Amino acid sequence: MATKKAGGSTRNGRDSEAKRLGVKRFGGESVLAGSIIVRQRGTKFHAGSNVGMGRDHTLFATADGKVKFEVKGEKSRKYVSIVTE
C-alpha cells in the first residue's frame, strides 16, 4: 500500500502587488496640464515650476509644455519642471 507522510504547512507564499511607481514622462517629452510625470513614495523628485504634488507625492503637470529634470540646490535635489513654449 503506497503511503506518504503528511507534508508540513508553510508560512510563505505571499507577495504584494506591484505599485507601478516610477517616471511616466521623461525629459523633453511634451505633456498636457494634469498629466502624471512621476509616481513615487516620498519625495525622490521635487516639484519645480508648473508642477504640482498630490497627497501621495505624485508629481503632475499644471501647464502644457515640455518636461525638464534638473539637479538644484545645496542638497543636490532632483527637481521636475515644465517648460512652457
From Swiss-Prot:
Pfam families: Ribosomal_L27
Sequence segments annotated as region (Disordered): 1-20
Family annotation (Gene3D superfamilies): 2.40.50.100
GO function terms (MF aspect): structural constituent of ribosome
Gene Ontology cellular-component terms listed: cytosolic large ribosomal subunit
Coiled-coil stretches: none
Record InterPro entries: Ribosomal_bL27 (IPR001684), Ribosomal_bL27_CS (IPR018261)
Disulfide bonds: none
Keywords of the record: Ribonucleoprotein, Ribosomal protein
GO BP of this protein: translation
Family: Belongs to the bacterial ribosomal protein bL27 family.
The name this protein goes by in its record: Large ribosomal subunit protein bL27
Organism of this sequence: Actinobacillus succinogenes (strain ATCC 55618 / DSM 22257 / CCUG 43843 / 130Z)
Gene name for this UniProt entry: rpmA
